[in-house]
Amino acid sequence: PVVWWCFAFFFLSTMTLAIVQTFSVSILQAMHHVSFEAATLTLTAYMLCAAAGMFLGGFVASRFPLRSDRVVASCMTLAALLMALCGSGWFNGTFAMVILASTGLAIGVGGPSRDMMIKKATPKGATGRVYGMVYSGLDVGFATSPLVFGVFMDRGWYGLTLVGGACVMLLSVMVALGVGKRSQAQKLVAER
């Protein structure tokens, strides 16, 4: 059912967030030799950009209410590309920090549409059960990500940790599009 797709979306997208929150400071220090203060400022900028993106994303969600899955997919694709660029090592520390903070903006813009996507996937009368199930994907993603990507960090694969996060985010894009497709099919069946 579509609820499991929603769970998978939250699981995968949160794995990427956990990488940023848990490892980005260490990655920036190891790859780009930036100071601890600059690296933590980048994490703060990421969070503030995500909050600003959420604000902007509210306008985007109201402008494209029928295409929430596509808005989410577009924002997450952009964020994945930015995260992969940051992990590539092609740029100096300052530019890498700006790119990582911009990733937060892209993810934030998709946030309100993400919530609308979940709302559309929820059958009538099942809101509490669905939201409880779906949002538990956040906890599972946060718990799983350090186990997987901590191994990368331990081996010194700092850039690959971010590139791996970008790949996981692209998987969440595919799942978001699957949620939209299944929600539409579920709606058509209910209308018959």
What kind of feature is each model-predicted range?
Residues 94-109:
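Hydrophobic core of transmembrane alpha-helices in multi-pass small-molecule transporters
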